A protein has these predicted regions:
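An amphipathic alpha-helix adjacent to DNA-recognition modules
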Residues: 2-26, 30
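Amphipathic, non-transmembrane alpha-helical scaffold segments
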Residues: 10, 14, 18, 83-90, ...
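Residue-level detector of well-ordered alpha-helical segments, enriched
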Residues: 13, 40, 44, 48, ...
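Hydrophobic alpha-helical connector segments
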Residues: 23-66
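Secondary-structure edge/capping motif, primarily at the C-terminal ends of alpha-helices
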Residues: 28, 32, 73-76, 131-135
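Amphipathic alpha-helical packing segments from all-alpha helical-bundle domains
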Residues: 42-46, 61-64, 73-105
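Short alpha-helical scaffolding segments that buttress acidic/His motifs in well-ordered protein cores
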Residues: 48, 52, 66-73, 120-124, ...
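C-terminal peripheral helix-coil segments that are non-catalytic and often amphipathic
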Residues: 91-174
Length: 174
């Protein structure tokens, strides 16, 4: 491995881990698609976090990656979903999961969906970053409880109706 500078090394690490996540998500989408043509919101939300969680369970280097870079999407001033996409995050499998999620959430217009997906990326990034720093973070019942609680939170985040207050402010800002 020859990199001209530290930035090049960091980008290579991020692209490698992103590719691993995309591949794992693609496997999970294929398994889900073979099971049902209309997955639940919970099953789709699981696609947002379970690939990274499983990789962290299986791979020490991936856990180190989460510890080192998990905070980056939290601290961005830009859309964290767009930032993740611009760094190779998501890929084809991420676009598939996003498309499935949009279809399952007809109550959200494009702007509301974008606000929710940004909040979801921040929630997942924060949660995984914190979890990676815990003892036995990705093994045992406590780790499974973490995963299922995070998926529950994502389901709530996406399933909630847009409040009249939020809609009024969104309309005002158009």
């Amino acid at each position: 491995y020859h990199f001209k500078n530290l930035t090049g090394l960091i980008e290579a690490i991020q692209l490698t881990r992103s590719a691993q996540t995309q591949e794992k998500r693609a496997e999970q989408i294929e398994a889900l698609s073979s099971k049902t043509t209309q997955p639940s919101v919970r099953e789709i939300c699981s696609l947002l976090v379970q690939p990274a969680f499983q990789l962290a369970c299986e791979n020490t280097d991936y856990r180190c990656y989460i510890k080192a870079f998990g905070h980056k999407l939290i601290l961005t001033d830009a859309s964290p979903a767009e930032m993740a996409a611009s760094h190779g995050g998501g890929g084809v499998s991420g676009k598939q999961a996003s498309g499935m999620l949009k279809l399952a959430l007809p109550h959200l217009d494009a702007a509301a969906y974008q606000r929710r997906i940004d909040a979801a990326v921040r929630l997942c990034s924060t949660s995984m970053y914190h979890q990676a720093r815990q003892k036995n973070a990705f093994s045992g019942d406590q780790a499974e409880l973490f995963l299922h609680s995070l998926v529950d939170a994502l389901v709530g985040l996406f399933s909630a109706a847009v409040s009249p207050q939020t809609q009024a402010l969104a309309d005002k800002l158009k």
